[in-house]
Amino acid sequence: SVIYSWDHLHKLHKSSKSSARENLIRRMTNYQDITGERVVIVFDGKGQTSESINDEYGIQVFYSKSGTTAYQIIERLAGKYSKNRKITVASRDRAVLDTCSSFGADAISPKTLEELLEQAERDLRKRMV
C-alpha cells in the first residue's frame, strides 16, 4: 500500500511494477542506513507457490505466497516480534494498523513513513555539510 500512497512510486508502478518495488527498497535501505533502524518490507507475491524472503541491499524483503496476502504476513510478524522489539508498521489499511497496534506495534500511515524518510534524508545532508 506504500507504493500506491507515494505519488512518485504510484506513477512508476503504472509503467514498471518491479521498478517501483526496487525504488522503495532502495529508499528504505537508505532509511535503515541513516537511522540504524532495521527495515523489513512485505510485498504481495503475485501467485508464488511459497513465501520467499530475500535479503536485498541489507534489508529483509518478504513476498507472500499464493493465497496469502502481504497484510497477513505483516500481522504475523508484528504479532511475533512486537513483544520483544520496537516494531513500526506502515500501511494505509486501517484493519492491519489496528491489528498490529493491538500486538504492541506502532502503526503509521504511508504518508507518515514518507515524512520520516524525508526527515532522515535531510538530517543526513546536514551532517555531510
Indicate residue ranges for each PLM-predicted region.
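Nuclease catalytic cores that cleave nucleic-acid phosphodiester bonds
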Residues: 1-129
